[in-house]
Amino acid sequence: MLIALALALQAVRLVLPLPQPVSTFVIGSLVHMMLVLTWRFSGLGTALLLALLLPLTAYLQGQVLLPLLIPVIWAGNVLFVVLLQLFSANHRLALFLPPLAKAVLMGVAAWCVVNIVALPNPALRKTIMFGMSVPQLVTAFIGIWLARQVFLRIRKL
């Protein structure tokens, strides 16, 4: 059920006409929240499955510009979820380290892809590099915070 909800939230951008930057930060935060909640309620294996499905659906929705970026996003999502698991006992590290590590990994890997493909358009290169770094950091951080708020409210029920 959590995987279906995450994929539905990711598809909101197809029906909700938001400007691209707003869509990126809103949908990205919700998707990261769902990665965290899936890990929390269904375990690491299910969260890793979701981590692999999300970039595929994003590509099919036209949100990933190059197919070679799918493994970059896979790697970032997997690292994010695994670090959540490893640092779950330390709330501060779990809040900051997974988003930071994901953003760094994706930024470096996207740089490699962009240079291997040798995109001729500098604006496209910058767009890809930005999208694979700063928004990942911000939306992952917000997603963890949102997931904690949801988790605390569910625990009160």
Over which residues does each language-model region extend?
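Loop-helix junctions at membrane interfaces
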Residues: M1-L157
